Amino acid sequence: MADAYEPYHVLQQSRRDKLRIPSLDSHFHFHPPPPPSSGGGGGVFPLADSDFLAAGGFHSNNNNNHISNPSYSNFMGFLGGPSSSSSTAVAVAGDHSFNAGLSSGDVLVFKPEPLSLSLSSHPRLAYDLVVPGVVNSGFCRSAGEANAAAVTIASRSSGPLGPFTGYASILKGSRFLKPAQMLLDEFCNVGRGIYTDKVIDDDDSSLLFDPTVENLCGVSDGGGGDNGKKKSKLISMLDEVYKRYKQYYEQLQAVMGSFECVAGLGHAAPYANLALKALSKHFKCLKNAITDQLQFSHNNKIQQQQQCGHPMNSENKTDSLRFGGSDSSRGLCSAGQRHGFPDHHAPVWRPHRGLPERAVTVLRAWLFDHFLHPYPTDTDKLMLAKQTGLSRNQVSNWFINARVRVWKPMVEEIHMLETRQSQRSSSSSWRDERTSTTVFPDNSNNNPSSSSAQQRPNNSSPPRRARNDDVHGTNNNNSYVNSGSGGGSAVGFSYGIGSSNVPVMNSSTNGGVSLTLGLHHQIGLPEPFPMTTAQRFGLDGGSGDGGGGYEGQNRQFGRDFIGGSNHQFLHDFVG
């Protein structure tokens, strides 16, 4: 017996022996120990987590022989309980250290074994084996019964259990196989799809094409408020998914091409193909999630519009662009009736109309801060581009349009207002100067301050002739008055008596106008004054008599000229 079972000196040999059931060639002779003092009923081995290895029998005639090994005594304390439904295989081994503590021969050794790591879902029939003839102490009464039990265990445990033979068959029947495969498929599946849904189509190249407007026409209608913002973000995410998938697909294709070019690496291409399938699966899951959210948002919007009483009518929507932004109402119920579409809510596949409101606010502030010179430098354009999130070309184009549409009309209006104001100020100053330089006549003064060079009709002064006759006391016909004002220029009047109607000379109409006196300068007279004019007025005689006559006549003429209809003439000329 000692030759058949060697002690364990090699770890691999120990592991192999634990998993192997040897053939039982020798007979076992079991002698029951004395019954315990408690006198309990028939108990069996506690088959929870231990393996019991039977080796040899007791070759002693004394049935009351007790085991003095403390380890065996401790083991015996577990005996006497009810039988369990599970057990492990029985192996035969020798334990010299245990045999040395006994008085005779081979002993029955019980060695615990670690928990089995088998994933088999089929319980081994040896687990439920109850050896007949087992008494309170758990030992067989006779060698024949023990031998029959060992043969039954060996027959029911048929099949190799080595590390390289039989594991596949055990794992296929394990109840943990399917959950483990599902977990692995969730994280690292490459397209098998045994326990998961079929989410990968036969043609994975469908993800390489951008989403068309027709595919998302039902969800691409602009909505106001948070609903429109959410849909805009989702569409942007969908576009980003397509772009990234294209990028990764091209990179993997390049890697596969490099594998095929190098000799000996042609077998690596299938792994890249599996990676492509996994990539397609993940990106398609993202695409389906985004499209489902878009569809849900679209349906939710339709329901809300129906509740508000505004049916959706996308055909009547017309884009209206205002300078630097968009006119759009943000109300949810009025989203179907508004005439503008928010620029920052526009779908990604449509051209943007205008710029976002935040960017336009920053650009307008800079324009009005630099109104006198609205031409930003390259540094200013880059700074504004960083602040607004726009490109440099967008900032430059906005300022070009702003200078044409906003700045230039404002400058022209300001210039027009300044021109009108200057014209009004110049006209008022000219009137003030005109008023200050014009001298009006005074009726209380003896000498007249102004007179007119207008011809008087011959039949318009019969009463003046009577007054002149009373003053001067003569019957001479006065036709002209020569007034020396000190300037050396002659002043002509058509002043005649209505009875005789003898005109002496007429005033010329081509003379200049004096701004000081308002008189016409007689430059081009037809003929010089006759020398007899002084004699007609009686001025060639005594100075006192002539002066008095001239003064009275001149005073009378001044009063007549200022009064009557000639007053209106002076008022019109000055005013």
Swiss-Prot record:
One of its GO terms (cellular component) is nucleus. Residues 348-410 bind DNA. GO terms for molecular function: DNA-binding transcription factor activity; sequence-specific DNA binding. Keywords: DNA-binding, Homeobox, Nucleus, Transcription, Transcription regulation. Residues 174-190 are annotated as: SR/KY domain. Predominantly expressed in stems, inflorescences and flowers. One of its GO terms (biological process) is fruit development. Its main location: nucleus. CDD domains: homeodomain. Residues 419-429, 443-463, 473-483 have a biased composition (Low complexity). It comes from the Eukaryota. InterPro entries: HD, Homeodomain-like_sf, KN_HD, POX_dom, TALE_homeobox. Residues 24-43, 306-337, 418-485, 533-557 are annotated as: Disordered. The keyword Nucleus applies. May form heterodimeric complex with the TALE/KNOX proteins STM, KNAT1/BP and KNAT6. Interacts with KNATM, isoform KNATM-B. The SR/KY and BELL domains are responsive for the interaction between the TALE/BELL proteins and the TALE/KNOX proteins. Belongs to the TALE/BELL homeobox family. Transcription factor that is involved in the preservation of the spiral phyllotactic arrangement leading to a regular pattern of organ initiation. Required for maintenance of stem cell fate in the shoot apical meristem, and is essential for specifying floral primordia and establishing early internode patterning events during inflorescence development. Acts as a transcription repressor of AG expression in floral and inflorescence meristems. Is also responsive of the nuclear import of SHOOT MERISTEMLESS (STM). This is BEL1-like homeodomain protein 9. It comes from Arabidopsis thaliana (Mouse-ear cress). The lineage of its organism: Eukaryota, Viridiplantae, Streptophyta, Embryophyta, Tracheophyta.
